[in-house]
UniProtKB/Swiss-Prot annotation:
The keyword tRNA-binding is assigned to this record: no
UniProt keyword annotation of Flavoprotein present: no
Name of the featured protein: Small ribosomal subunit protein uS9
UniProt-listed InterPro entries: Ribosomal_Su5_D2-typ_SF, Ribosomal_uS9, Ribosomal_uS9_bac/plastid, Ribosomal_uS9_CS, Ribsml_uS5_D2-typ_fold_subgr
Membership in a protein family: Belongs to the universal ribosomal protein uS9 family.
Organism from which the protein derives: Chromobacterium violaceum (strain ATCC 12472 / DSM 30191 / JCM 1249 / CCUG 213 / NBRC 12614 / NCIMB 9131 / NCTC 9757 / MK)
Gene of this entry: rpsI
NCBIfam families, per database record: PRK00132.1 (NF001099)
GO molecular function per UniProt: RNA binding; structural constituent of ribosome
Domain of life of the native organism: Bacteria
A Pfam cross-reference name: Ribosomal_S9
A GO cellular-component term linked to this record: cytosolic small ribosomal subunit
Keywords, alphabetical: Ribonucleoprotein, Ribosomal protein
Listed GO biological process terms: translation
PANTHER family xref list: RIBOSOMAL PROTEIN S9 (PTHR21569), SMALL RIBOSOMAL SUBUNIT PROTEIN US9M (PTHR21569:SF1)
Length: 130
């Protein structure tokens, strides 16, 4: 990436995304692949474009993303968080609109650990009276 770029780190579940944003034509590259090729589901692509659509910058920036860890949903959420932070780096005035939509706050929900003596995190073995 040549010239001025804007950076944002996004996290969601166990995914971490590093987002590099530069003035351009609206091309989004995730781990070397176009976003439409990387994310099979439409929901992932939609989630990624939300902050850009909100700020009316869908075709103003070329975005290059490196994302590691987690699954499809977690990675999409991490990229959205990173794009939001990069947009704030570009123009701090956008923060209020992005914050009102809930994109600035990191979603802190994580998988709850499995406990000893239970089948899952909270699911106990079936109880039989007789």
């Amino acid at each position: 990436m040549n010239g001025k770029y804007y950076y944002g780190t996004g996290r969601r579940k166990s995914s971490v995304a590093r987002v590099f944003m530069q003035k351009g034509s609206g091309q989004i590259i995730v781990n070397g692949k176009p976003v439409d090729e990387y994310f099979a589901r439409e929901t992932g692509r939609m989630v990624i474009r939300q902050p850009l659509a909100l700020t009316e910058n869908l075709e103003s920036f070329d975005i290059k993303v490196n994302v590691v860890g987690g699954g499809e949903t977690g990675q999409a959420g991490a990229i959205r968080h990173g794009i939001t932070r990069a947009l704030i780096d570009f123009d701090a005035a956008l923060k209020s609109a992005l914050s009102a939509a809930g994109y600035v706050t990191r979603d802190a929900r994580e998988v709850e650990r499995k406990k000893v003596g239970l089948r899952k995190a909270r699911r106990a073995k079936q109880f039989s009276k007789r």
